[in-house]
């Protein structure tokens, strides 16, 4: 490992070239002149792996203002404006403003390229810009008149504007030709190289490589004085909870006479043993207390910060506050110590007690950090180059790990901070570091008085960073509270948040994530020896999980052959990397044990760190997110720490600058809510059924919404908002009409229509948004092709790079410079992939970023809080998409006699009736449907405006569709011999269902698709129900998980919230936090008690196991399995023995249609409900009756005849 703990000299005659990793901007005040100057710092890494900081000292923050009432200002008026603003600025900002009049176009509405006057305000520092921005919200006297100015682009961060102006990528390569290494002391950083330059010298460097970035993963281990989950700063909350529990145990005593003696007795043991307490407090403590009844409640011990405490004084104070404690418990306290200001909410009894106890009892010690593990790898390497663990107390050596031991926790934290400075990581990562590690480290440092070391870990010299708590909300993650210590110049990546955002997994525990992603196939095995498809990522001492069941340790690795520590006789098919399970209790015990015991914790800690490095590599986290940052023109840190809005805004702002447009500042009214909405994406009503003999081909519009914006030129600068720009001679227009609705769901009502008019520019030029989208889609297409590039070398050492088309005799190369070269095979010396796996990963991340960004642009146009929000654009886009879906449906039905059985947003599902028309079955039918789909999509393309294209995507065969957005089938693309099961919306895709649903419902689906036998499906269901009620399924298959939100309207009715609160009462430290997924299972309860809420019917799996609580199997049948299975099997009702005849339901449908006054949809839904009820009666009722009788203790009639029910 090459540590970055030494400076590097640069030759100023050579360009400074580096890849940017992070950005920081601030105002720097010169102590001599007292003038403030705006500074941009770029932190990066050179090709050699050196860390570098560039100070850009002369960029001027600026924004624009305009007036609706006054278009042009004289120089005198501009001077008056400048003088007015300067006079309002603080004294040391007097020389920081310049005012200039410029000509620009407004993006807000079509103006036929008409320019107008704007005033550009430029500043020496950002603070004066902020002050002026606020000042201009009010009318200002210019000359003799009061002018209300409109702000434009005052919401663009100056350093983002610098990125736009210099045309650089915020995570790309930079070249600086003129600079100085003589940097002011105040601007020095801790990087190895420090330079200062002018903004004009910062130029983009065309380079596809990724610098050898240092990525450091870290993890902490803590112990607990109480045996509960560790808490960094302790209060008397647990004692308060115990007092409340003790009080409740005396509720049968109307006067609570026994409570006070019991309180004193329980209190005796929290600091010391009873005997010592009695000796110290004998004067004040009646020894008869030892005989009093505490209802078997014992308070947990606490550990004050001071070793010596005055027990006598404590007991005196306790006696003095006894009446107050009782008042609180009776909810009568008005003591000022309990008053809370937050939202006027009445604090809970426990909170009031906690505040009181904290006010007079000695402060407590928090639970210490006992180890911090760190592992480092450089981008481009697949292995960690350095592993380190810092331990509290002694620890045995660990092979390959640098073990540093410390005598105190303060020394441990200081050593870790030193390590950060030595390694100088560019990226810091870990698992749940925003939810646990950072917060814990900071709070422990705060209690120990060494927080200055933690707050000094940034790359800024002499800078004290801040601890931040930040709420980040997104559609992918919901609400997230991020807690972290700022380290300017370093980028934080919480791997747990990344995985939660991008992947849908059953569990987000590190063990499960590792085994899911770092996994493969077992080719062959012989007891302890396994031949894997690839052993990449596996090291000696690692743990792997086989068949997702058996956890084994790896004893040796030789190429792709490994030896494990367990003999296995059954067939092993899959492997996945796992982690060594060490429970919290084991960690607590090991810390109190020997050096060898502590080494066990250390190995576990380092293993968790290294897993994060491996996942960063495997998931290409750095390459993918850096690609997104460069596409959206925002720093890498914004991808992890900011929302979607800023990414799209920066991209649009750059295009506007290039096109000489100005973006007005939208004024948001926080209190107003739009009553009217518009119609979203179209979803065609499905024809539900099990399509066994009819292949269903799917045709999909490529990038429907981006293409719709391009084809109709939907943009801020093309929509006609001013009548004077309507019907201009020589200008063509396109009208888009959309429906306006009020209400949602069943109350959604169409109230009007609105037509928007979009100007079509000359020479097929496009507006700002379509141009951005065209670039993104074009760049994505070329990047995807680039991944496929090969480099062909001839015998005479000529080389050609591009797309290669091979046939038997020759090879044709379409080169990167658009030439076509054809070579005979005899001329070719070699043909290899142009890019290695790392470069392919970078390119793949880039093409994905282009796709996501193109789709996000439409979303931001329709988001009320977006700086580019305009509802009309979003509504016009969805209206265009709906029209195109209906057009495709009509074309297929009219020209091919097909049935469109479903349509969703951007695709149609088509039955070309190949059996009826051609008499084809099985694979012949499948191939025919694929062939027709390809031809039909080509024929339809002639009916579409560019760039729209309806492409053949896939064919389902068989296909089951239940309702809108709920279907499943075997998916084929072009090869009729290769398929995979694909589903949408069905219970198999829901994360809040128990695994039993996947086993039973998934098993039925598998039988229907692959065996196409209803009887087999019914028998499988009955056998599964038998196993369930007999307890033959593992409890893990019955666990449900749901995400815990920060707030709920009525938390008492949210089952997992009630459970989380119950867990918090049992053990505050281990309770789930906001955004955590809470696991639980349903347990048996008193079914006669109708007042029980859902939260009273569930428990945490570990609690169920430890206390032998019975599972409620009836719930899993009625609430998890029955509804989806009844909905599925109702599609095949008439094939089930003893079912009703079809004619009965046909008559019922006609009757209900009349009853519902012709509302056929409502009648169909009612008939569907009746079919599902019949399925329940046929397949479930017998088992449910049996279970209910068993729970109620009722004997069944068959028992009297010695017959066992099925």
Swiss-Prot record:
Q: Quickly give the catalysed reaction.
A: DNA(n) + a 2'-deoxyribonucleoside 5'-triphosphate = DNA(n+1) + diphosphate
What InterPro entries does its record include? DNA-dir_DNA_pol_B, DNA-dir_DNA_pol_B_CS, DNA-dir_DNA_pol_B_exonuc, DNA-dir_DNA_pol_B_multi_dom, DNA/RNA_pol_sf, DNA_pol_B_thumb, DNA_pol_palm_dom_sf, DNA_pol_type-B
Q: Does the keyword DNA-binding apply?
A: yes
MF terms from GO for this chain are: 3'-5'-DNA exonuclease activity; DNA binding; DNA-directed DNA polymerase activity; nucleotide binding
Q: List where this protein forms a coiled coil.
A: none
Supply the EC number(s).
Answer: 2.7.7.7
Signal sequence range: none
Q: What Gene3D superfamilies does the entry give? A: DNA polymerase family B, C-terminal domain, DNA Polymerase, chain B, domain 1, Helix hairpin bin, Palm domain of DNA polymerase, Ribonuclease H-like superfamily/Ribonuclease H
Q: Does the keyword Transferase apply?
A: yes
GO biological processes: base-excision repair, gap-filling; DNA replication proofreading; nucleotide-excision repair, DNA gap filling; viral DNA genome replication
Q: Which residues cross the membrane?
A: none
**Keywords carried by this UniProt record:** DNA replication, DNA-binding, DNA-directed DNA polymerase, Nucleotidyltransferase, Transferase, Viral DNA replication
Q: What class of enzyme is it?
A: transferase
Q: Which family does it belong to?
A: Belongs to the DNA polymerase type-B family.
Q: Know the name of this protein?
A: DNA polymerase
Name the species this protein comes from.
Pyramimonas orientalis virus (PoV01)
Q: Which gene is annotated as encoding this protein in its UniProt record?
A: dpo
């Amino acid at each position: 490992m090459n540590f970055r703990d030494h400076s590097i000299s640069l030759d100023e005659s050579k360009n400074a070239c580096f890849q940017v990793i992070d950005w920081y901007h601030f105002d720097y005040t010169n102590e001599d002149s007292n003038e403030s100057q705006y500074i941009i710092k770029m932190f990066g890494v050179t090709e050699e792996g050196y860390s570098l900081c560039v100070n850009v000292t002369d960029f001027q923050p600026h924004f624009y203002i305009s007036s609706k009432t006054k278009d042009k200002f004289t120089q005198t008026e501009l001077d008056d404006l400048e003088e007015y603003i300067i006079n309002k600025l603080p004294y040391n900002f007097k020389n920081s403003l310049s005012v200039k009049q410029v000509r620009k176009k407004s993006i807000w509405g079509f103006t036929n390229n008409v320019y107008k006057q704007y005033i550009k305000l430029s500043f020496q520092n950002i603070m004066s810009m902020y002050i002026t921005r606020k000042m201009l919200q009010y009318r200002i006297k210019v000359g003799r008149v009061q002018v209300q100015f409109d702000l434009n682009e005052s919401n663009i961060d100056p350093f983002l504007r610098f990125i736009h102006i210099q045309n650089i990528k915020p995570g790309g390569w930079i070249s600086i030709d003129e600079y100085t290494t003589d940097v002011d002391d105040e601007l020095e950083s801790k990087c190895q190289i420090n330079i200062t330059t002018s903004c004009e010298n910062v130029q983009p460097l065309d380079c596809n490589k990724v610098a050898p970035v240092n990525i450091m993963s870290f993890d902490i281990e803590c112990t607990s004085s109480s045996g509960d989950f560790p808490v960094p700063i302790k209060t008397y909350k647990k004692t308060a909870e115990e007092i409340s529990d003790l009080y409740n145990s005396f509720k049968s005593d109307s006067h609570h006479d026994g409570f006070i003696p019991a309180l004193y007795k329980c209190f005796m043991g929290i600091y010391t043993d009873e005997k010592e307490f009695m000796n110290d407090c004998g004067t004040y403590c009646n020894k008869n207390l030892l005989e009093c009844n505490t209802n078997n409640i014992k308070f947990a011990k606490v550990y004050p910060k001071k070793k010596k405490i005055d027990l006598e004084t404590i007991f005196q104070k306790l006696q003095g506050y006894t009446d107050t404690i009782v008042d609180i418990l009776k909810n009568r306290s008005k003591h000022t110590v309990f008053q809370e200001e937050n939202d006027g909410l009445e604090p809970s009894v426990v909170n009031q007690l906690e505040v009181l106890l904290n006010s007079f009892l000695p402060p407590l010690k928090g639970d210490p950090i006992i180890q911090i593990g760190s592992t480092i790898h450089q981008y481009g390497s697949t292995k960690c180059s350095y592993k380190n663990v810092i331990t509290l107390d002694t620890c045995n050596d660990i092979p390959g790990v640098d073990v540093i031991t410390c005598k105190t926790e303060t020394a441990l934290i200081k050593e870790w901070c030193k390590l950060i400075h030595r390694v100088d990581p560019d990226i810091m990562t870990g698992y749940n570091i925003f939810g646990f590690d950072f917060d814990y480290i900071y709070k422990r440092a705060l209690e120990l008085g060494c927080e200055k070391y933690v707050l000094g870990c940034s790359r800024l010299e002499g800078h004290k960073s801040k601890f931040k708590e930040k709420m980040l909300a997104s559609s992918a993650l919901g609400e997230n509270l991020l807690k972290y210590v700022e380290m300017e110049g370093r980028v934080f990546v919480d791997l747990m948040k990344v995985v939660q955002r991008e992947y849908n997994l059953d569990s987000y525990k590190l063990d499960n994530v590792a085994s899911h992603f770092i996994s493969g196939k077992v080719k062959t095995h012989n007891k302890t020896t396994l031949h894997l498809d690839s052993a990449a990522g596996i090291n000696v001492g690692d743990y792997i999980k086989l068949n997702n069941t058996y956890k084994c340790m790896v004893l040796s690795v030789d190429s792709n052959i490994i030896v494990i520590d367990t003999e296995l006789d059954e067939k092993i098919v899959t492997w996945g990397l796992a982690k060594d399970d060490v429970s919290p209790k084991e960690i607590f015990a090991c810390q109190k044990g020997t050096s060898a015991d502590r080494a066990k914790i250390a190995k576990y800690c380092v293993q968790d760190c290294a897993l994060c490095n491996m996942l960063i590599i495997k998931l290409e986290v750095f390459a993918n997110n850096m690609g997104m940052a460069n596409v959206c023109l925002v720093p890498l840190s914004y991808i992890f720490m900011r929302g979607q809005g800023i990414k799209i805004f920066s991209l649009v702002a750059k295009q506007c600058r290039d096109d000489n447009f100005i973006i007005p500042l939208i004024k948001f009214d926080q209190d107003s809510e739009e009553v009217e909405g518009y119609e979203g994406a179209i979803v065609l009503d499905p024809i539900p059924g099990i399509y066994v003999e009819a292949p269903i081909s799917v045709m999909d519009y490529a990038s429907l919404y981006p293409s719709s914006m391009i084809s109709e030129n939907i943009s801020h600068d093309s929509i006609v908002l001013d009548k004077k720009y309507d019907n201009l001679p020589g200008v063509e227009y396109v009208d888009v009409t959309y429906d306006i609705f009020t209400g949602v769901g069943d109350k959604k009502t169409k109230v009007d229509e609105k037509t928007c008019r979009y100007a079509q520019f000359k020479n097929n030029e496009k507006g700002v948004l379509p141009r951005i989208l065209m670039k993104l889609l074009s760049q994505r297409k070329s990047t995807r092709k680039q991944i496929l590039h090969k480099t062909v070398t001839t015998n005479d050492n000529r080389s050609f790079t591009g797309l290669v088309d091979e046939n038997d005799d020759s090879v044709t190369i379409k080169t990167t410079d658009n030439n076509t070269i054809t070579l005979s095979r005899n001329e070719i010396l070699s043909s290899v992939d142009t890019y290695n796996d790392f470069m392919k990963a970078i390119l793949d991340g880039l093409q994905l970023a282009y796709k996501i960004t193109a789709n996000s642009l439409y979303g931001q146009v329709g988001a009320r809080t977006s700086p580019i929000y305009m509802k009309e654009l979003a509504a016009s886009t969805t209206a265009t998409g709906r029209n195109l879906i209906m057009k495709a449906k009509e074309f297929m039905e009219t020209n091919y006699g097909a049935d469109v059985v479903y349509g969703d947003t951007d695709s149609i599902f088509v039955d070309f009736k190949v059996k009826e028309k051609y008499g084809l079955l099985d694979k012949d039918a499948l191939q025919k449907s694929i062939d027709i789909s390809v031809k039909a999509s080509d024929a339809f393309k002639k009916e579409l405006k560019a760039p729209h294209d309806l492409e053949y995507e896939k064919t389902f065969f068989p296909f089951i569709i239940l309702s809108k957005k709920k279907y499943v089938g075997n998916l084929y693309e072009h090869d009729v011999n290769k398929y995979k099961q694909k589903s949408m919306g069905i219970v198999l895709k829901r994360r809040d269902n128990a695994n039993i649903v996947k086993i039973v419902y998934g098993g039925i689906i598998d039988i229907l698709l692959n065996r196409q036998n209803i009887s087999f499906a019914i028998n499988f269901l009955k056998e599964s129900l038998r196993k369930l009620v007999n307890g033959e399924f593992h409890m893990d298959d019955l666990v449900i998980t749901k995400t815990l939100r920060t707030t709920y309207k009525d938390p008492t009715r949210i089952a997992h919230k009630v459970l989380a609160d119950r867990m918090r009462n049992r053990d505050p430290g281990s309770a789930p936090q906001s955004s955590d997924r809470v696991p639980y299972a349903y347990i048996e309860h008193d079914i006669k008690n109708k007042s029980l809420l859902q939260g009273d019917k569930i428990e945490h799996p570990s609690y169920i196991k430890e206390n032998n609580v019975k599972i409620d199997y009836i719930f899993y049948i009625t609430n998890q399995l029955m509804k989806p299975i009844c909905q599925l099997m109702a599609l095949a009702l008439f094939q089930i023995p003893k079912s009703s005849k079809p004619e009965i339901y046909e008559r019922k449908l006609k009757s209900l249609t009349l009853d519902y006054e012709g509302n056929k949809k409502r009648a169909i839904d009612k008939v569907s409900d009746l079919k599902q009820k019949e399925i329940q009666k046929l397949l479930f009722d017998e088992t449910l009756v049996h279970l209910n009788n068993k729970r109620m203790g009722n004997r069944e009639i068959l028992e009297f005849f010695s017959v066992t029910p099925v």
